[in-house]
Structures are given as C-alpha cells and as structure tokens.
C-alpha cells in the first residue's frame, strides 16, 4: 500500500504527465531527429543548438527507443511509435555489428562506425530498448535482437571462473586495456554500473522470454548485488572491482544507490523467487533510508560523497533526482517513509 495522500498523488500525476507530454517528449521529437543523415543528432547545446555533425552514440539512441516505446504503450499516440521506429531502424541499420555481433559504441554523423568496441553497458541498454519496442508494436526481430544480445553477453563478457561481467571488449570480443565507460571512471574490469544495467535489461527481457538460461543469469546477477555490490554494513554500493573482486573504490554515489534499490527489488519480483523477493524488499527499504543522508531538503539529492576526504560533491545532476522519485516511491510501498515527498516537490 502506498502511504501518500490521494490528493497529493493525483496532483503529482497531473504535474508529471504535463511535464512529460508538453516538454520532455516534444523536445526530443522536435529537436533531435536528424532528417538529413538519419537517426538523431548527437549533440544539442544548452541553448538548443543542434549539431548535426556530432558523433552519434548507441546509448542515446537506445534510450530514445525505450522512452518512446514506453510512452506509446501508455498513451497510444502514433507519433510516439513513429519516433521509436526511427530509433529502432537506425540502431538496426547502423549500430548493429553484423560481422562480429553486438553493437558499436559510436558512429560519425553519417552513420559510419567510429568506436567499434563492445561496451557491455551499451549492449544492456539495447536489450532493454529492443524488448520495450517489441512490447509496443510486436516487432519480432526486435525481440530476437534482444535475445541475441543476451547470448553474446553471456558468451563473451561473463567471467565463468570468478563470476561477474567484464566492462568492455574489442570489436572481436577480445580483452582491451582501457575499459572505461567515460574518462572520469576508474579503469577496472568489473563495475557496479554496468552490472546494474545488465540487471535492468535481463529483468525486462525475462518478463517476455522465460528461458531457463536467462532465469539462471538473472538469479546470478541479483545475487551478485546482494553478495558483492551492496555493503551490508553501510548499505551503500561498492562501485569498482578488479577481476578478482578486490574493491578499487571508496566513494558513495547516491543516485546509483537509490536506483539499485528499486531495480533490484523489481528484478527479484520478476524472477519469482520468494526468498529473494523478501530479501530484496528489505534491502530496498534499508538503502532508501540510508540514501536520505544525501538528501538536501532545499535542493534535492547530492551527487557523491568521498568518506576518505570527508568531502561531498554537492552538484545536482538530473538523473539522481529522477531515480530518487522512483526509489523512494518503491520504498514507501513497504513502509511509511516520507522523504520522497521532498524530492518530488524539488524535481
């Protein structure tokens, strides 16, 4: 049961729906499509200047595909499905590596590969997006692509000796020295962030593809979080590891903490293991409670904290606020937590 005033919930729904339908979705539908070269523009400035010659990334295209597929499922607006189809066609026509499998990380503005390595984070986002597109329109090849990518992750990125998934591989699925997702990340081969999005993708795919191998993989990655990534003393996430699961980081990411709380709970529910469901429900509440320490009641959730330096990065990034909305709502379904209302008002 959700412990929040019904009138507040109704007002919140109205506000969120207005923001989504009058601002967020029209922004991407109006400014982002690259009508000259296909797909979507790789860069839009803060002043809404569209750079049609910027490189194009798979993660952005996958996120657009997922978003407009999900929007179509709720509102049944043909324009949303048309936007999703544009993303789907560009991913299949340009990002898909038909020789080696997987998807390219980055293309130039004309659609030619620039960065061809296999970033497992990107493969996970593509699975997530393809599955949602299948939900939206029943495109069988989209679901087949998601299943194929799952198989490639399991074949090439799973560490069968020590468990966990390798961060990145070459185009031909060979080891690479620099596996970083971005320049600010630690160059370590097993990261919480990539595992979190594999968890998200496998959860979505398992809803519609009840394959025993996928069930086993989803069960395994849930347990990697409960046993490896979540610190049971602090209830924060451990973020970077080497191949042998030696911890290589000591900072706190509040956005990832609250994101993990609800994604893990959702995954356990989809898997259908009662014991794991109960455990992950308790974890979700505990992680949400601890997450309040990063919540500024005037300005929202801070970004990171570095215990060794007793220093906080108090920048407000958009995505931790969005994850906090979902994560706190999820925790509220178990208990009488109230801090979620502060975040909702701030966002």
Language-model regions, residue ranges each:
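Low-complexity, Ser/Thr/Pro/Gly-enriched N-terminal "stalk/linker" regions
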Residues: 2-58, 78-86, 90-103, 160, ...
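Well-ordered alpha-helical segments within folded domains of soluble proteins
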Residues: 3-5, 55-73, 81, 118-135, ...
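Extended ligand-binding clefts on enzyme/binding-domain cores
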Residues: 19, 23, 150, 157-169, ...
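Carbohydrate-binding/catalytic loop surfaces
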Residues: 37-55, 100-122, 164-190, 234-255, ...
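Extended ligand-binding groove/face enriched in aromatic
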Residues: 78-190, 194-196
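Conserved small/polar residues in nucleotide/adenosyl-binding loops
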Residues: 335-342
């Amino acid at each position: 049961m959700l412990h929040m005033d019904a009138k507040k919930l109704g007002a919140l729904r109205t506000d969120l729906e207005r923001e989504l339908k009058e601002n967020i979705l029209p922004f991407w539908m109006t400014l982002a499509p690259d009508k000259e070269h296909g797909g979507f523009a790789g860069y839009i400035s803060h002043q809404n200047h569209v750079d049609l010659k910027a490189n194009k990334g798979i993660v952005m295209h996958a996120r657009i595909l997922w978003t407009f597929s999900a929007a179509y499922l709720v509102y049944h607006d043909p324009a949303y499905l048309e936007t999703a189809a544009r993303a789907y066609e560009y991913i299949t026509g340009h990002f898909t590596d038909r020789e080696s499998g997987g998807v390219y990380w980055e293309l130039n503005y004309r659609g030619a590969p620039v960065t061809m390595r296999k970033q497992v984070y990107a493969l996970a986002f593509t699975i997530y997006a393809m599955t949602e597109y299948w939900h939206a329109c029943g495109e069988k090849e989209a679901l087949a692509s998601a299943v194929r990518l799952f198989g490639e992750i399991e074949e090439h990125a799973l560490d069968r000796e020590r468990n966990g998934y390798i961060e990145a591989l070459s185009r031909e699925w060979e080891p690479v020295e620099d596996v970083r997702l971005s320049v600010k990340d630690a160059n370590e081969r097993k990261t919480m962030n990539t595992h979190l999005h594999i968890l998200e993708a496998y959860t979505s795919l398992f809803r519609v593809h009840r394959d025993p191998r996928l069930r086993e993989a989803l069960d395994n990655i849930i347990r990697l979080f409960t046993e490896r990534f979540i610190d049971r003393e602090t209830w924060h996430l451990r973020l970077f590891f080497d191949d042998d699961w030696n911890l290589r980081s000591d900072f706190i990411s509040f956005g990832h903490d609250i994101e993990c709380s609800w994604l893990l709970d959702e995954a356990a529910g989809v898997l259908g293991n009662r014991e794991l469901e109960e455990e992950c429900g308790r974890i979700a509440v505990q992680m949400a409670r601890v997450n309040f320490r990063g919540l500024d009641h005037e300005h929202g959730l801070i970004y990171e904290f570095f215990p060794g330096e007793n220093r906080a990065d108090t920048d407000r990034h958009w995505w931790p606020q969005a994850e906090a909305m979902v994560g706190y709502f999820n925790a509220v379904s178990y208990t009488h937590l109230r801090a979620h209302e502060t975040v909702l008002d701030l966002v």
